[in-house]
Amino acid sequence: MADSFKFDLVSPERLLVSETVTEVVIPATLGEMTVLANHAPTMTTIKPGLVTVKFASGETHKYVVFGGFADILPTGCTLLAESAVSADDMSPDTLQKRIDAAKAEIQEGNHHHEHLTKLEKHLYELTNLHEVLVAA
């Protein structure tokens, strides 16, 4: 049996997961990151994407996150998400509404270049996430 560690997934709305797990795959800003027990201490930002959690029981569950931070220690991982839901509760239609809202905000045109770049990056990440959900 693989070594296990404590994993917490927290959003401002609620605590989604606080369990013993064997593996977590997170959408770090610089690419997908697999966290296992005894991982080197790391802190990273999270982009919109899927978090895949493999519980000590062997069960796997996915969550959709919309940005945040992950604090990784050898004994545990805490993911503080700006917003998060179970992937079972996130439909492609709901995500499409977020994409449409991001497009509308970009089209308003009253943005400084730096803010516009962030909006475009966010739209790109949401679009990629939508493609992942539709394919799943």
Swiss-Prot record:
Q: Which locations, inside or outside the cell, does it occupy?
A: Cell inner membrane
Which positions make up the signal peptide?
A: none
Q: How does it sit in the membrane?
A: Peripheral membrane protein
Q: What does the UniProt keyword field contain? A: ATP synthesis, Cell inner membrane, Cell membrane, CF(1), Hydrogen ion transport, Ion transport, Membrane, Transport
Which terms does the record give in the GO molecular function aspect? ATP binding; proton-transporting ATP synthase activity, rotational mechanism
Q: Name the residues that span the membrane.
A: none
* GO cellular component terms, semicolon-separated: plasma membrane; proton-transporting ATP synthase complex
Family to which this protein belongs? Belongs to the ATPase epsilon chain family.
Assembly information from the UniProt record: F-type ATPases have 2 components, CF(1) - the catalytic core - and CF(0) - the membrane proton channel. CF(1) has five subunits: alpha(3), beta(3), gamma(1), delta(1), epsilon(1). CF(0) has three main subunits: a, b and c.
Q: Which PANTHER family match?
A: ATP SYNTHASE DELTA/EPSILON CHAIN (PTHR13822), ATP SYNTHASE EPSILON CHAIN, CHLOROPLASTIC (PTHR13822:SF10)
Purpose? Produces ATP from ADP in the presence of a proton gradient across the membrane.
Q: What is this protein called?
A: ATP synthase epsilon chain
Instruction: State the encoding gene.
Output: atpC
